[in-house]
Amino acid sequence: MAYFKLEFGFGRSKSEGKISDSANQADEQAVLEIPGWDFVKGEVERAKQEGRFKVAGNYLTAARSFTKFIGRSDWLFSDMTAEKLESYQRWLLGHNICQNTCSAYMRALRAMHHRALPFLNIAPFSKVFTGRTKTEKRCISQSEILQLKALPLQPGGSLSFARDIFLFSFYAMGMPFVDIAYLKKSQLRNGCIYYARHKTGQQIQVALLPAMLEIIMRYEQRDSEFVFPILSDKVENSVSSPSVSAQQHRQYTARLRQYNYNLHQVSKMLGLAKPLSSYVVRHSWASIAYLHHLDISLISKALGHTKSSTTFIYIKSLFDSDLFEANQSLMQDLGL
C-alpha cells in the first residue's frame, strides 16, 4: 500500500511526496470500498480454522445485525462512519437489545474494521459504547438448591438430566458445562476429577463426592469414553485443542442450548424469580461458598480464575447485603 511508501520514503523530493500522498489517499479510499460481507466471510473462516469458533460466531452475529440495520447486504466499510454507528446503537437499544449485547456487537465490528483497515487514522467507534455494564447478580440461594434437588421429575427425562448436570456442576465447585460435556472417564482417578478449564487452561482437581458419583453412575455409558451422554464418541479431540472441528463445536453448542432451555423449564416449575442457566450455577456456588466463609483465594482457585478480581465480580453484590445487615444491626443496637 502507499502507506509504506509514505512512511518509509526518506530522502524523497517534495514532488515525490505529493504523488505518494495522492496515491495513499487513493489506496485508503479503495480499502474503504471493500465489500463488508466478503471480508466478514473471510474472517469467520479464518477464525474457524484457528479453532476460535466463539469469535467466528460473534463476527457473524454482529455482521448480520449490522446488515439488518443497513437494510442491504452489499454494505461497505465506508458505511461504518461515526454517525452511522451511533444511529446503529440507537437502533439496537430501540429494539430492546441490552447494552452489553450492543457493546459486544460493536466490539466485533470494530475488530473486523481494524483488520480490514489497520493503517487508516480513523476511529468511527469512538462515540459508541464498547465497554461492559454491571449485570444483575445471577445466583440462587442454598434453599433453592435444595428445592431443585427435591423437585420430582421423571427419571431419565431431559429435565431430570438437566437438573442432575446442574447439581453435578454445583457439587464440583462450579465446574463449567463445557468441561462437563468433554469430561472423560480417564480424568476420574484416585477419587478425584482432574481437568483443565477450557476458558483459562487452569488445572483443577475436584474431590469426587458421593452425590457426584451417584449422578455419574446414573448416566454411565459402558461403550463411551465420556462420563456423560452429552457428546457422541465421534468427538475425539478436547474442545481446547486447535484441531477441534466445526462439527464438534456445533454439537457442543446445540447441547448447551438445549441444556439452558431445559433449565429454564425447571425454573418455571420451581417458580424461581431468576431462571437457571449454565452461568447461574457457577455464581451460586461462589456466593454460597463465600457466605460459608470460604477464603476468596480458594474460591478463585476452584473456579479456575487466573485473577481474584474476576472472582470478586461473582460475589461483589453480596457485600451490599452484608452492609445492609450490618447497618440494620447497628440501628437496632441504637434503638432506632
Predicted feature descriptions by range:
Residues 155-157, 251, 260-301:
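Short, basic (Lys/Arg/His-rich) helix/loop patches that form interaction surfaces
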Residues 126-138, 142-177:
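Basic, Lys/Arg- and aromatic-enriched nucleic-acid-binding interface segment
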Residues 209-273:
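Active-site/catalytic core of tyrosine-dependent DNA strand-transfer enzymes
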Residues 65, 94-126, 175:
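N-terminal DNA-binding recognition helix of tyrosine site-specific recombinases/integrases
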Residues 205-210, 219, 316-336:
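DNA/chromatin major-groove-contacting recognition/catalytic segments
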Residues 8-10, 15, 19-94:
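Basic/aromatic-enriched alpha-helical hairpins
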Residues 186-192, 273-274, 294-315:
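Short, polar N-cap/turn motifs at the start of nucleic acid-interacting alpha helices
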Residues 139, 197-201, 303-328:
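Catalytic-site neighborhood detector that most strongly recognizes the C-terminal catalytic loop/helix
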